[in-house]
Amino acid sequence: MGEANKFDLYVPADTSKESYGLVVYLHAGGFTTGDKADDAGMLQWLCSKGYVAAGINYTLFSEQHPEANIYTQSMEIKEAVPAVAAQAEKLGYPIDAMAIAGGSAGHCLAMLYAYRDADTAPAPVRMVFGAVGPSSFYPEDWGCYGLDQGTEESNAAAAGLFGVMAGRSITPDLFGTSAYDEAMKDVSALLWVDGGTAPSLMAYGKHDKVQSFPASIRLDEALTAHGVPHDYIVLEHSGHGLQNDQQEFHQYYQKIEEYLDRYLPVE
């Protein structure tokens, strides 16, 4: 794997078990910045609970890597997860089940892995959790960037932005058609939701200016429609940083523990 895809692996002190649960946590940074080291605290906490925990880097969209996009990043994660499990096994920690999670961009990538790529995983994906990750790209939902105006100008801007994100050529005439869903499906976790989707915990800020809050409503509705066990925590007074609703923020972290105990119990 390339430099960008190196991973940090945290393994528990107890080596006596026949198998372990793996939790992958993907870093935030708007697909352009960030590093697995940013999540050392989260990874150490997961490890202290008895999990094998891993942070994975992915190639960031930049002047050096103008070809990087959500799709290429998601494919790097897809390739990296089996390598993480193989390394854990080599160290004496065979993996029998896993969860994947992340913040913001990392949450977007975690959902894509759990919803789109679970059948390629080295162990069953039992759950996904995360905060403020985009799961679909409909211009009418992206008022945070003024892309919901329905004008020639705003549609052109939306086509440009979403095209870069997907690594596809998107033209405004695609909006509102099934061809648009087809073009964006590989980067839209929403479009992979079905009855077999992994239990999902997610938190979103109602005043998010960085990614689309309305997209999270669509996701909640899709998970509900397909009977997927999930919790959708809305921070009514917060933006992307989930900074103004201490009670709900605390509830999100409590729910992480609940979900791990329920879906990925440490035996």
Region annotations inferred by a language model:
Residues 1-267:
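Alpha/beta-hydrolase superfamily serine-hydrolase fold, recognizing
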